[in-house]
Amino acid sequence: MFKKIIVFTSCFLVFACAGDNGKITYVEDLTTLKNTSSGQVIGFKHINNSTAWFGIPYAKPPINELRWRAPQPIEDSEKIIKATSFSDICFQNRSFVDYSEEKENYIGSEDCLYLNIHSPRNLSGNENLPVMVWIHGGGNTTGAGSGYDFSRLASEQKVIVITINYRLGPFGWFYHPSLIETTNSKEDKSGNYGLLDQILALKWVKKNIKEFGGNPNNVTIFGESAGGHNVFSLISSNLASGLFHRAISQ
C-alpha cells in the first residue's frame, strides 16, 4: 500500500495547456482497441507521441430518475465505443467560460459523465505505469476534463493521465427534502453528487486502467482550485478509500 502524499504548490508545472471543448473528431486507430467495463473503446494516435481515448462513459447518464442521485456504474458492456472526440461538458453557465455573444446563457449537457485518457504511444498493456487522475477547477460550477491537454505529460514522463467530467452547480451539489423522499440511500441524500461522480470515476480507473498499461495500485489524484479542494474531500472520504495512493492539491 502506498503512503498518501499531499503536495501543495504555488507554481503548478504539469506541462499541460488549455484545450478546446469543440467537437473535433480524430481518426480512429484499431490498434488502440481496449476492453473495458464500458465497452470496447477505440482511440487514436495523438500529438506529442501519445495515444488518447476521449469521451469514455464511466457512469450511466444522470438524467430523469437518476438526476440528483448518486451516479450509477455502467454494467459490463461489449459495445464498441469510438473514443475519438470529447463528450459534452457538464451543464454550466456560458458566461464563465465563453464570452461570445450567444443567445443561450447555458452550455453543456446533463449527460456528461465521461473521462479521457492520455498515454505514451505503443504500449503493450503490460507496462504497469503510474496513473494520474486530474480533477479540474472552476468553483465546482464550470470547467471540464476536456479543457486540458496532458499528451506531453503522458509521453515524456511515462504516465497514464486521465481527466474527468463531474456534475457542476445545482446538478452536482444540491439538497432539498423533496428530492430524497423516495430514496433510502445515504449517498442519494447527501447532495454531494459531483464528489460521488469523482469517486465512481476513480472506481472505473481501478477496474480498467491495467488494460491501458496503468498500475491500479499506483494512482495519484491531482487538481487545482475547486479541483484541489475536491482532492481534500476525496482524502477524507471513506468512500474513496483504496482508490488512490497519492494526492496533489494546488
List each model region and its residues.
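Active-site loop->helix "elbow" adjoining a glycine-rich segment at hydrolase catalytic centers
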Residues: G137-G138, Y193-D197, S225-G228
